């Protein structure tokens, strides 16, 4: 089994992005699966082009995109990606779409194929906070999650794909009072647990567990 794991470069004025820093530190093999690591730009469309080339080259069984969600306390596997680009800030090439569809011929939304409840449980079992998230935002994180699902829908039907958000690093919140963060080593530990759960649940589907939200 082969899993392509991607992490974004820094954006929004930060000099570091925990996504790519954590991805780079993942082991080369987790629970018997080969881990392919890829840095992608925080840029609408270009990020998808980079991922598509890697899919064509590596032919992974799974794709897990990792992104920073500053303000969240734990690791949060994402349930759904929506067909909208709506940038709160410009991307790293200065592009700021304001309520535009990602693909005119794409579905309104795509659900992940990954066992997000099993991922969240595995992360918590590793001693770290985690919960299922029902929104990946409307920036490049949601964009790449949606784009990979669109690729799956149109070109790569055998791939299973999803996204997980991670918190800020402590050094990123020095001047962001009362903002949660997580040590890089713990983020790596959490991602490793999530990836192990993906491998363990291969062919079995997700677990039955309470992970819903009222709002």
Curated annotation (Swiss-Prot):
EC number assigned by the record: 3.4.19.3
MF terms in GO: pyroglutamyl-peptidase activity
Enzyme class: hydrolase
Lineage: Bacteria, Bacillati, Bacillota, Bacilli, Lactobacillales
Coiled-coil features, chain-numbered ranges: none
Name of the featured protein: Pyrrolidone-carboxylate peptidase
NCBIfam families hit by this protein: PRK13197.1 (NF009676), pyro_pdase (TIGR00504)
InterPro entries, alphabetized: Peptidase_C15, Peptidase_C15-like, Peptidase_C15-like_sf, PGP-I_bact-type, PGPEP1_Cys_AS, PGPEP1_Glu_AS
Active site: 78, 141, 165
Job of this protein: Removes 5-oxoproline from various penultimate amino acid residues except L-proline.
Subunit note: Homotetramer.
UniProt subcellular location: Cytoplasm
Keywords, in A-Z order: Cytoplasm, Hydrolase, Protease, Thiol protease
Any Gene Ontology biological process: proteolysis
Cited PANTHER family: PROTEASE FAMILY C15 PYROGLUTAMYL-PEPTIDASE I-RELATED, PYROGLUTAMYL-PEPTIDASE I
Catalysed reaction equations from the record: Release of an N-terminal pyroglutamyl group from a polypeptide, the second amino acid generally not being Pro
Hydrolase is among the record's keywords: yes
The family this protein is said to belong to: Belongs to the peptidase C15 family.
UniProt KW Nucleotide-binding keyword: no
């Amino acid at each position: 089994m082969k899993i392509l794991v991607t992490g974004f470069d820094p954006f929004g004025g930060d000099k570091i992005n925990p996504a790519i820093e954590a991805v780079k530190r993942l082991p080369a093999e987790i629970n018997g699966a080969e881990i392919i690591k890829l840095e992608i730009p925080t840029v609408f469309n270009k990020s998808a082009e980079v991922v598509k080339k890697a899919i064509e080259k590596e032919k992974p069984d799974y794709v897990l995109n990792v992104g920073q969600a500053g303000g969240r306390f734990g690791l949060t596997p994402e349930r759904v990606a929506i067909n909208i680009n709506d940038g709160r800030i410009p991307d790293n090439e200065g592009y700021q779409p304001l309520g535009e569809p990602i693909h005119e011929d794409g579905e309104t939304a795509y659900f992940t194929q990954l066992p997000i409840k099993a991922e969240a449980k595995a992360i918590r079992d590793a001693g770290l906070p985690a919960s299922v998230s029902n929104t990946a935002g409307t920036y490049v994180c949601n964009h790449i999650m949606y784009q990979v699902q669109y690729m799956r829908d149109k070109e790569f039907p055998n791939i299973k794909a999803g996204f997980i958000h991670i918190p800020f690093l402590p050094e990123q919140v020095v001047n962001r009072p009362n903002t949660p963060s997580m040590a890089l080593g713990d983020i790596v530990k959490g991602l490793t647990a999530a990836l192990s759960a993906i491998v363990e649940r291969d062919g079995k589907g997700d677990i039955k567990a309470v992970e819903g939200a009222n709002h």
